[in-house]
Amino acid sequence: MVSGSIALNIYGIPRMTRDIDIVIELSENRIDEFINLFPNSYFDKNVIKNEIKRQGMFNIIDHSTGFKIDFMIRKDSEYFTFAFQRRSRIKELDTELWVINLDDLIIAKIIWIQQSQSEKQMSDIENLLLNPEKNIDYIKTWCSKLNLQTFNLLDNE
């Protein structure tokens, strides 16, 4: 499931990026199958195993272009499982992709700002909230369930 800056672009917020964030479901018994999807790339199987266990992330970099793909292991919780199930299949530039749902992208950004309230992240959230397709009740419900500080971003919604 595509997330991050690419998802922002899909939802109408232009952002230049040299990477792509992809949330994946991956188990240890499917690592070889995953690696075979990228025959020209190198992966350290032990790193992938460790990241699966800690529900972290790993990446590949195309050294000729510097383009990077960050693979984030879907976290095993009620919210992240539900958000992954809510992803949307879209067609973008003649390619079909699974992309994070708008509401879950907003929540992902709110989760991100719990650590650091960067102006860029705050601005992204404000701009995403302008989208009339959002489901503000869903967003507020999950922010409350996850005990997230919203920094007054949802106050006018």
Task: Report each predicted region and the residues it spans.
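Compositionally biased terminal segments of proteins
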Residues: 1-157
